[in-house]
């Protein structure tokens, strides 16, 4: 039994985490078990398509991508999915294709949007005393 060439990558945005399994196949792309064409919300569907459209659908004809996403809200999940797909494609090409095609993919992704490969490190600031949030203060009264 020969092992199917596969890689596993993840994408994160805020508290949403998407794990992508990229393996040799026939071009299927699924998110939480359903096709990528059914990603909700519909307005953000093209954000998920971005890695596919940037490099061309011919690169996806011989691989399958399965993405599992948990946590966060709708928008965070969409950004985590697109990052996981982009990182998975780069990792697959590095491991099983060649270095030149990997570098072409990385260059295409980073020139379009850096967050396709590098996670957004911003996190919520912790609340402090003297106010209801991190920066806002309670109203001051003089009399």
Swiss-Prot record:
Per the record, the GO terms for biological process are: maturation of SSU-rRNA from tricistronic rRNA transcript (SSU-rRNA, 5.8S rRNA, LSU-rRNA); translational initiation
Cross-link position per record: Glycyl lysine isopeptide (Lys-Gly) (interchain with G-Cter in ubiquitin) = 30, 47, 59
Localization (cell): Cytoplasm
Q: Which GO terms describe its cellular component?
A: 90S preribosome; cytosol; cytosolic small ribosomal subunit
- Asked whether the keyword Ribonucleoprotein is assigned, the reply is yes
Q: Where is the major localization of this protein? A: cytoplasm
UniProt keyword terms in alphabetical order: Acetylation, Cytoplasm, Isopeptide bond, Phosphoprotein, Ribonucleoprotein, Ribosomal protein, Ubl conjugation
Q: Per its UniProt entry, which superkingdom is the organism in?
A: Eukaryota
Q: Which residues carry this modification: Phosphothreonine?
A: 70
What InterPro entries is this protein classified in?
Ribosomal_Su5_D2-typ_SF (IPR020568), Ribosomal_uS9 (IPR000754), Ribosomal_uS9_CS (IPR020574), Ribsml_uS5_D2-typ_fold_subgr (IPR014721)
Q: Where is the composition biased (Basic residues)?
A: 134-143
Q: Which residues carry this modification: Phosphoserine?
A: 34, 61, 76
According to the UniProt record, which cysteines are disulfide-bonded?
A: none
| Gene Ontology MF terms | RNA binding; structural constituent of ribosome
Q: Where is this region: Disordered?
A: 123-143
- The chain residues annotated with the modification N-acetylserine are 2
The protein's matches in NCBIfam families, at most eight in alphabetical order, are given as: PRK00474.1 (NF001749)
What is the protein's quaternary organization? Answer: Component of the small ribosomal subunit (SSU). Mature yeast ribosomes consist of a small (40S) and a large (60S) subunit. The 40S small subunit contains 1 molecule of ribosomal RNA (18S rRNA) and 33 different proteins (encoded by 57 genes). The large 60S subunit contains 3 rRNA molecules (25S, 5.8S and 5S rRNA) and 46 different proteins (encoded by 81 genes).
What is the similarity comment for this entry? Belongs to the universal ribosomal protein uS9 family.
Q: What does this protein do?
A: Component of the ribosome, a large ribonucleoprotein complex responsible for the synthesis of proteins in the cell. The small ribosomal subunit (SSU) binds messenger RNAs (mRNAs) and translates the encoded message by selecting cognate aminoacyl-transfer RNA (tRNA) molecules. The large subunit (LSU) contains the ribosomal catalytic site termed the peptidyl transferase center (PTC), which catalyzes the formation of peptide bonds, thereby polymerizing the amino acids delivered by tRNAs into a polypeptide chain.
What additional remark is attached to this entry? Answer: Present with 33800 molecules/cell in log phase SD medium.
Q: Under what name is this protein listed?
A: Small ribosomal subunit protein uS9A
Source organism per entry reads Saccharomyces cerevisiae (strain ATCC 204508 / S288c)
- From the UniProt record, report the name of the gene that encodes this protein: RPS16A
């Amino acid at each position: 039994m020969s092992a199917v060439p596969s890689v596993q990558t993840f994408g994160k945005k805020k508290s949403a985490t998407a794990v992508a399994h990229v393996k040799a196949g026939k071009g299927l792309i699924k998110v939480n078990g359903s096709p990528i064409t059914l990603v909700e919300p519909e307005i953000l569907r093209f954000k998920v398509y971005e890695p596919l459209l940037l490099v061309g659908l011919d690169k996806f004809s011989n691989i399958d991508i399965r993405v599992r996403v948990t946590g966060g809200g709708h928008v965070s999940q969409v950004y985590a999915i697109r990052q996981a797909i982009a990182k998975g494609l780069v990792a697959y090409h590095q491991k099983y294709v060649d270095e030149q095609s990997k570098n072409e993919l990385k260059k295409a992704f980073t020139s379009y949007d850096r967050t396709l490969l590098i996670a957004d490190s911003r996190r919520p600031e912790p609340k402090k005393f003297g106010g209801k949030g991190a920066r806002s203060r309670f109203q001051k009264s003089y009399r």
